[in-house]
UniProtKB/Swiss-Prot annotation:
Signal peptide extent: 1-23
Species in which this protein is naturally found: Homo sapiens (Human)
PTM-bearing positions, type 4-carboxyglutamate: E47, E48, E51, E55, E57, E60, E61, E66, E67, E70, E73, E75, E80
Name recorded for this polypeptide: Vitamin K-dependent protein Z
Span of domain Peptidase S1: 175-400
Function: Appears to assist hemostasis by binding thrombin and promoting its association with phospholipid vesicles. Inhibits activity of the coagulation protease factor Xa in the presence of SERPINA10, calcium and phospholipids.
Database matches in Gene3D superfamilies: Coagulation Factor IX (4.10.740.10), Laminin (2.10.25.10), Trypsin-like serine proteases (2.40.10.10)
Length: 400
């Protein structure tokens, strides 16, 4: 009997424990709450330790402005991001052209272009020339079947990327030393005066090849014996004088209408580059009319008339393109495909015939216009010029 007592006591203890609620262990629902709270507290601690993660805060989840501000730590950048973030899906507007596919991202969208197209919005055909290209040809561009081809102005050759143009000749056109690139240039190596047999200056001209000067047809027919004169880079007071051996007036020059008012003057001997002068570049048609003239500011340069004489100092003025219709109304002229107009915002001047308009593009200066006789009574702050790019074939026929 005594041996049964411990057995009975153990049985009673087991029954008692079975009726007691196991408070050491929580129910599943409460246990999950504890786990969730602990997990959130842990992630919050990590977020405090590390910089804000934009993708986690605003892409995987919906963020508030303050969370984005913690990531950028800059109000301007945050505001820019917030405008895009709250603007909705950019791909809804179908920004990717030519059947490109659009993918939303935290910063906006990304386009995957169809074969043959490129650009941020697939807007550029790979075989075409576009002025908008930031990585396109430095000078001239020719479209092809699968891709475009680059070429360069006189005295340059293509670089290793087949896009950049590298000067390889001492007479490479349009190159200025770094200290003479400012738009208020007072001494341009391609600008020359024309002088008659009596030593009187009567017109201006511009060197476009070391042995050719371009001027107006009217100027070239004023005198029989013409000499080109330049003071560029002269150490003495005496100018460099070179005689003209041949005058090439454009075959379609119309003196009455003033059309095709251009003439090429062939020099007796070539100018020694770069010390005595330097040619300016002559642009191809598409390059000039789609990029140079409409997209860059021009520089009008020449000598102003002081009565019947020309001033001693070369004058330069910044100019911009004027639409043909406006120019035609102001100057009472017909603006053709071979002419265009420039406007200067500074005081009016009486420019001599043969003054020129040049434009700088990526380190090279290009000739875009030559001034002829201006309309009577026209406003001197606006000038009509001959569009040089329309005559590139004629230049090649004469000079080559």
């Amino acid at each position: 009997m005594a041996g049964c007592v411990p057995l009975l006591q153990g049985l009673v203890l087991v029954l008692a424990l079975h009726r007691v609620e196991p408070s050491v262990f929580l129910p599943a629902s409460k246990a999950n709450d504890v786990l969730v709270r602990w997990k959130r507290a842990g992630s919050y601690l990590l977020e405090e330790l590390f910089e804000g993660n934009l993708e986690k805060e605003c892409y995987e989840e919906i963020c508030v402005y303050e969370e984005a501000r913690e990531v950028f730590e800059n109000e301007v950048v945050t505001d820019e991001f917030w405008r895009r973030y709250k603007g909705g899906s950019p791909c809804i507007s179908q920004p990717c052209l030519h059947n490109g596919s659009c993918q939303d991202s935290i910063w906006g969208y990304t386009c995957t272009c169809s074969p043959g197209y490129e650009g941020s919005n697939c807007e550029l055909a790979k075989n075409e020339c576009h002025p908008e290209r930031t990585d396109g040809c430095q000078h001239f561009c020719l479209p092809g079947q699968e891709s475009y081809t680059c070429s360069c102005a006189q005295g340059y050759r293509l670089g290793e990327d087949h896009k950049q143009c590298v000067p390889h000749d001492q007479c490479a056109c349009g190159v200025l030393t770094s200290e003479k690139r400012a738009p208020d240039l007072q001494d341009l190596p391609w600008q020359v005066k024309l002088t008659n047999s009596e030593g009187k200056d009567f017109c201006g001209g511009v060197i476009i090849r070391e042995n050719f000067v371009l001027t107006t047809a009217k100027c070239s027919l004023l005198h029989r014996n013409i000499t080109v004169k330049t003071y560029f880079n002269r150490t003495s007071q005496d100018p460099l004088m070179i005689k003209i051996t041949h005058v090439h007036v454009h075959m379609r020059y119309d003196a009455d209408a003033g059309e095709n008012d251009l003439s090429l003057l062939e020099l007796e001997w070539p100018i020694q580059c770069p010390g005595a002068g330097l040619p300016v570049c002559t642009p191809e048609k598409d390059f000039a009319e789609h990029l140079l003239i409409p997209r860059t500011r021009g520089l009008l340069s020449g000598w102003a008339r002081n009565g019947t004489d020309l001033g001693n100092s070369l004058t330069t003025r910044p100019v911009t393109l004027v639409e043909g219709e406006e120019c035609g109304q102001v100057l009472n002229v017909t603006v053709t495909t071979r002419t265009y107009c420039e406007r200067s915002s500074v005081a009016a001047m009486h420019w001599m015939d043969g003054s020129v308009v040049t434009r700088e593009h990526r380190g090279s200066w290009f000739l875009t216009g030559v001034l002829g006789s201006q309309p009577v009574g026209g406003q001197a702050h606006m000038v009509l010029v001959t569009k040089v790019s329309r005559y590139s074939l004629w230049f090649k026929q004469i000079m080559n």
